[in-house]
């Protein structure tokens, strides 16, 4: 898949998950983050890497935060933020519970869900 900058909606979701996880990321992460869509049936999952740390041999470390939201068609969605073995941002894993393509990322996220 093609590397690109994240969209505003993706940035909003990532910022929410990063803040929820209370991890430290560089102050310029928004400017330097490169995303690559995962082959997940268009549910919205992304590989994450900072532009100065492009490495294809990174390994999953752990999930550090997640949130739940409802897509515009009423289907539940779970978004998880994962880091690699070195503690760097690794994946935004989005799972729409009926496996259909994600329609939208909401403007706000409920901190009481999940």
Where are these regions (language model features)?
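N-terminal domain-onset segments
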Residues: 1-65, 104-114
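Short gly/ser-rich anion-binding loops that grip negatively charged ligand groups
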Residues: 68
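Short, compact, well-ordered microdomains
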Residues: 71-114
